[in-house]
């Protein structure tokens, strides 16, 4: 193969790799930090709505809570169980807690 052919092949492979990377749908994220309340429920609902509208492949929730209202916690659990996309909850960063989760 000539140098020109090798260079052209390299550029084609690079373009294909970049195209494949940009084609993947995004992963949405939301951070919940504090007491679980009706405001937290609304935050989760908005994050799910946005993630689904953006055609995200998943929603990642970063959670750090001492707990909160049982009614809000149960409503959040129902929303997550009925979500149209996968939801991943990460208790973090290190030292974080999830008392009502």
Predicted regions and their residues:
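N-terminal secretory signal peptides that target proteins for export/translocation
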Residues: 1-2
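Bacterial N-terminal signal peptides
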Residues: 5-19
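Soluble extramembrane regions of membrane proteins in the secretory/endomembrane system
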Residues: 18-101
């Amino acid at each position: 193969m000539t140098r020109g052919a090798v260079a052209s092949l390299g550029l084609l492979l690079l373009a294909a790799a970049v195209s494949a990377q940009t084609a993947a749908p995004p992963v949405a994220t939301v951070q919940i930090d504090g007491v679980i309340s009706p405001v937290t429920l609304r935050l989760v609902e908005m994050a799910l709505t946005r993630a689904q509208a953006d055609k995200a492949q998943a929603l990642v929730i970063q959670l750090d809570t001492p707990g909160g209202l049982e009614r809000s916690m149960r409503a959040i659990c129902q929303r997550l169980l009925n979500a149209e996309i996968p939801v991943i909850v990460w208790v973090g960063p290190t030292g974080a807690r999830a008392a009502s989760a």
